[in-house]
Amino acid sequence: MKRLAKSAFLATAASMLSACYQMPGDAYRLAETRQTYASETFGEVVFSRISDDVVMHTSTLDLPGMGPVRSNGLIVIADGRSILVDTAWSDAQTRNILDYAEQVLEAPVSDAVVTHAHQDKMGGIGALKAAGITSWAHPLTNSEAVSQELLPAERTLTFDRGWAVGPSRHQLAPLAIYYPGGGHTVDNITVGIEGTNIAFGGCLIKGSDAQTLGNLSDADVRNYASSARNFGAAFPAADTILVSHSPPQGRRAIVHTIALAERL
């Protein structure tokens, strides 16, 4: 299989912090592992190997007044296929992702889930539709997509106590999809990967060195902190936290996001 080399980690430097942030029913470990991941560019998109079966895709769009903004999503490989978590900014970039999964990873994308109704997460839905790939989203995401001038996903997720249930549970395995409540947007969902220590906080969770919570134009400011806590509690064993706009993080990113949100 033409994957990135299994020795994907070029260098690892670990810095352990012993403090913890206490919350009801949980204690957040602040252990941070900073790693340099093997990466390669395919078309307009950069691909970084996080584990044998998880690849992070990074696409960039030049936004007026902001300059180039990078956005991360995932390709999760399972049983000879792959599942896409978030599209790129555009259809063209998303086609690069689909081609990479098929030609390089030899694991064509069968399904995709988008984590909220912003362009960096679902701007490539058109490419998925053209390729016949089933796309899934929170019901609020599909309703919000119209107001954001975005194409909605093809199917709607069903949730029970925060967790996605029903047909998507099998179709999107090994993803464990969790709605923590509103934060970055009212519809933001998060993703754990069963059998790993990896969770994706999307745009809800910020990097541990972030100065702000970023774009709050569609935010649920009142519930942001509690939703970030819910994410951490939902995936207590995850110590590799992937986020939309920073390199891979440790659990400190969750604590830092909560602290930023409590200042709102």
Language-model segments: what does each one mean?
Residues 1-9:
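Bacterial N-terminal signal peptides that target proteins for export
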Residues 80-82, 92-136, 236-237:
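Active-site metal-binding motif and surrounding structural segment of the metallo-beta-lactamase
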Residues 49-98, 190-203:
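Conserved beta-strand hairpin/beta-sheet module of binuclear metal-dependent hydrolase folds
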Residues 21-24:
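Bacterial signal peptide processing site
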Residues 42, 49, 89-90, 127, 139-256, ...:
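Metallo-beta-lactamase
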Residues 17-19:
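C-terminal motif of bacterial Sec signal peptides marking the signal peptidase cleavage site
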Residues 58-71, 147, 209-218:
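Acidic/histidine-rich helix-loop elements
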